[in-house]
């Protein structure tokens, strides 16, 4: 879409400015960030699970990349300090991938809610996605794939210290 296109154009411009000025410029694209102070869809999911209105997600075997905010900070420091990173683009993940159901279950555990043994059937989400392009977008954000490789970042020596499986109540 237009957002992705303009973001990419801005990245290219920044890299060009860095190259021509001799300034160290690197781009870090974080995957879905979780941890203290993080806002957005994960915060909404957590609040919905806590209050009991978030639907139990089906296991659709999708894959999503994530990174803890503390690990993202370490990745940013590494890229800023390592001369090899100059002029490069990196993707920051914890190196694992999770299904939306696994994310849902991790949040249930963090807020001390029993993990339901049932889920809303995927066909219900499929029907909802037919209602409008906005609903299709929301369902895809929830159940679609967003899985990326951080091998390039790892080549600088980055290794995430946290994973979603170790998430606890101090992460929110």
Q: In which residue ranges do the predicted regions lie?
A:
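Flexible, glycine-rich beta-alpha linker
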Residues: 23-43
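Amphipathic alpha-helical segment in the mid-to-C-terminal domain
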Residues: 69, 100, 160-161
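Alpha-helical membrane-targeting segments
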Residues: 44-69, 114-147
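The catalytic Tyr-centered alpha-helix of NAD(P)H-dependent dehydrogenases
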Residues: 2-6, 30, 65-69
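Substrate-positioning beta->alpha
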Residues: 38-44, 58-80, 87-88
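Active-site Tyr-X1-5-Lys
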Residues: 1-26
